[in-house]
């Protein structure tokens, strides 16, 4: 789910999803509160973090909340790569917040744009550091395997080889 209203009551929806066996993967950012990829420093502030924490509070107690994305395609080209430390800080802050509130361990990670020039470096960066700093998982949005394509035409054979020893789950 890309965005939610963290002030609304989601009990009915989450109950219907649970009844259907559906788990929620939720981006905690919203159109109003998100990192500005071009100039992330000013957007990473107390008001922004409080919005993210409100989203965690709204969804952490649902058993079918599967995971939280700390960001989605914030880094979408070489020019926006300097936003990476801010995404990593959001991951850290969310993990610490979840722990401090006594919520169950809910995985937090990043969903990346499939930018060939920094794809692997971003995956490595999000997986380095202390347990509090690094992602619980790493996802990348890859649209290369669209019909008519194949495992090799889409380049997935090379991706599987490159990420073969990656130590956190890839989504």
Regions found by a protein language model. Give the residues of each.
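Noncatalytic carbohydrate-binding groove/subsite architecture in carbohydrate-active enzymes
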Residues: 80-171
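Hydrophobic faces of well-ordered beta-strands that scaffold small-molecule active sites
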Residues: 1-2, 24-28, 66-70, 108-110, ...
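Aromatic/His-enriched, Gly/Pro-containing loop or helix-boundary segments
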Residues: 32, 36-38, 47-54
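Acidic (Asp/Glu)-rich catalytic clusters
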Residues: 10-24, 54-64, 125-133, 160-165
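Aromatic-lined substrate-binding rim segments of carbohydrate-active enzymes
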Residues: 1-40, 88-109
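Acidic-and-aromatic substrate-binding clefts and catalytic sites of carbohydrate-active enzymes
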Residues: 1-11, 33-35, 43-46, 76-77, ...
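Active-site groove signature of glycoside hydrolases
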Residues: 53-83, 109-111
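Solvent-exposed, polar/charged alpha-helical surfaces in well-ordered, non-transmembrane soluble domains
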Residues: 15, 50-57, 63, 85-92, ...
């Amino acid at each position: 789910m890309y965005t939610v209203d963290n002030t609304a009551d989601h009990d009915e929806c989450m109950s219907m999803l649970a009844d259907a066996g559906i788990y929620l993967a939720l981006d905690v950012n919203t159109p109003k509160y998100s990192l500005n990829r071009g100039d992330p420093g000013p957007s990473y502030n107390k008001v922004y973090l409080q919005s993210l924490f409100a989203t965690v509070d709204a969804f952490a107690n649902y058993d079918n909340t599967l995971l939280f994305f700390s960001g989605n395609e914030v880094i979408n080209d070489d020019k926006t790569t300097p936003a990476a430390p801010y995404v990593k800080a959001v991951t850290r802050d969310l993990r610490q917040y979840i722990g401090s509130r006594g919520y169950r361990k809910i995985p937090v990670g990043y969903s990346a744009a499939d930018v060939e020039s920094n794809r692997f470096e971003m995956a490595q960066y999000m997986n380095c550091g202390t347990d509090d700093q690094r992602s619980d998982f790493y996802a990348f949005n890859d649209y290369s395997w669209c019909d008519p394509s194949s495992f090799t035409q889409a380049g997935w054979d090379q991706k599987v080889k490159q990420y073969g020893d990656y130590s956190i789950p890839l989504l």
